[in-house]
């Protein structure tokens, strides 16, 4: 039962493998599908008796060698329901994109306020080179890391900041189903009923922080439909059996959360307009890590970090990102010459001041910037024509 649902196929049986290949080819030829995402894809790496040890899955090899399937996008959830975890170079599909569960959990824990997470967040923003090494033997690329915080499995983005506990009673399994460890934080109030205005505002700010970190990280960003307007499943983190308002997209929330939708849309546009963020290789010498000052504090108690990303190699602007994951207001000092920098993103501000066009922002007047608790600031320095 490696799928958790009792219907696992032995994918490396030659007849089953042929069925899978024929099905994929049919979808590409007849349905013009240009990509596939494989749930619990580590099942591919199981022997017939369920043991692990295949150096390369015959099915994955067949997909790689197929002239039709070789050109489509392949995405793996690189684990299964029985404990096999193959994130990054451990997965047999060397060119596959992979859902990065470490990114999800580390970013959740940092935004939640867990201690000891600064070093992990640095690694995730950099492109998760611990999982996707680009040495000669592995030859991975950071874009293979699918960076996400929420998906169809588990909480929505809004529920991630609105619930501490799962609320799956409607599923009929006495609230025992669904993930127990969600690394969520409700901002001081469980659910929406009676939630104070200050709690609701903090939730929006935390959701913007999640959006920021996903969009600023090297790799391939992913979010779930509805997260861009704070859709909710009312705390249900396993609504597989719900064909009702629990699992449906509530389009009224788009109307109610236009300000957040604006922020989300502009963050996507910001990423697309700055190729220095999403590279085929890691940032390497183009990035410099800082804390509130020149040196980064990676102690267990630290919740702050910053980084400068030189955009020259991509003919892009320079970026300076300041991240305050702690409760208290913090003063960050820009570790670059002051000239030319403008503040374009500040999750501590209300809309529309939370994200602005470069032309609408004044030059910085000081190297010292005060960041509210649990907020992210992004500075941009346009590149002057040569």
Regions found by a protein language model. Give the residues of each.
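Flexible glycine/proline-enriched surface loops and loop-helix/loop-strand junctions
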Residues: 5, 141, 244-248
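Short, solvent-exposed loop/helix junctions and linker helices
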Residues: 10-17, 53, 142, 204, ...
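Glycine- and acidic
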Residues: 9, 42-43, 189-197, 245-253
């Amino acid at each position: 039962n490696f799928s958790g649902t009792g219907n696992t196929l032995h994918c490396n049986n030659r007849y089953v493998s042929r069925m899978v290949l024929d099905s994929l080819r049919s979808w590409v030829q007849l349905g013009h599908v240009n990509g596939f995402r494989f749930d619990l894809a580590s099942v591919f790496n199981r022997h017939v008796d369920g043991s692990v040890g295949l150096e390369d899955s015959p099915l994955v090899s067949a997909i790689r060698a197929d002239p039709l399937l070789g050109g489509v996008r392949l995405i793996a959830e690189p684990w299964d329901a029985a404990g096999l975890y193959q994130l990054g170079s451990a997965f047999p599909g060397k060119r596959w994109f992979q859902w990065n569960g470490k990114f999800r959990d580390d970013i959740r824990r940092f935004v939640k306020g867990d201690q000891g997470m600064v070093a992990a967040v640095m690694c995730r923003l950099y492109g998760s080179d611990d999982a996707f090494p680009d040495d000669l033997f592995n030859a991975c690329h950071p874009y293979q890391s699918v960076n996400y915080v929420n998906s169809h499995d588990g909480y929505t983005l809004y529920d991630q900041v609105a619930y501490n506990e799962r609320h799956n009673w409607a599923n009929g399994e006495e609230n025992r189903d669904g993930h127990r460890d969600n690394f969520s934080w409700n901002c001081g109030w469980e659910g929406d009923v009676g939630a104070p205005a200050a709690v609701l505002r903090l939730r929006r700010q935390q959701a913007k922080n999640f959006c920021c970190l996903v969009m600023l990280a090297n790799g391939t960003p992913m979010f779930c439909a509805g997260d861009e307007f704070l859709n909710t499943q009312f705390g249900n983190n396993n609504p597989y059996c719900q064909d009702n308002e629990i699992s449906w997209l509530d389009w009224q929330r788009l109307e109610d959360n236009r300000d957040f939708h604006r922020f989300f849309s502009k963050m996507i546009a910001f990423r697309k307009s700055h190729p220095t963020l999403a590279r085929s290789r890691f940032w390497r010498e183009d990035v410099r890590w800082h804390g509130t000052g020149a040196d980064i504090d990676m102690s267990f108690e630290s919740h702050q970090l910053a980084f400068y990303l030189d955009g020259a190699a991509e003919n892009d602007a320079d970026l300076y990102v300041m991240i305050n994951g702690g409760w208290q207001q913090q003063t960050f000092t820009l570790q670059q010459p002051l000239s030319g920098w403008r503040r374009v993103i500040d999750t501590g501000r209300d809309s529309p001041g939370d994200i602005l066009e470069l032309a609408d922002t004044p030059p910085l007047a000081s190297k010292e910037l005060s960041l509210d608790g649990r907020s992210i600031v992004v500075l941009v320095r346009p590149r002057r024509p040569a």
